[in-house]
Amino acid sequence: MLAIQALGFIAEDPQRLADFFAATGITAEQIRAVAAEPAFLAGVLEHMLGDESLLLAFAANAGIDPAEVARARGVLGT
């Protein structure tokens, strides 16, 4: 699932992870509890869509078109 891949991309870099925590207010402990919830996963993609440099870095790393992130966000709804 693209959202899980995006979360992993964020988590593998301390600065990206710190930015995610600061922007969302979530903690590492809370992520463990909600990681499979569609609303949380939609939020991960929403965070990525709100930061163009993050979005482009993730898309390049994943070998996908950045528009795929928006499409995945739409599929998750909420």
Report the location of each language-model feature:
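Metal- and O2-centered redox machinery and metal/ROS homeostasis
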Residues: 1-78
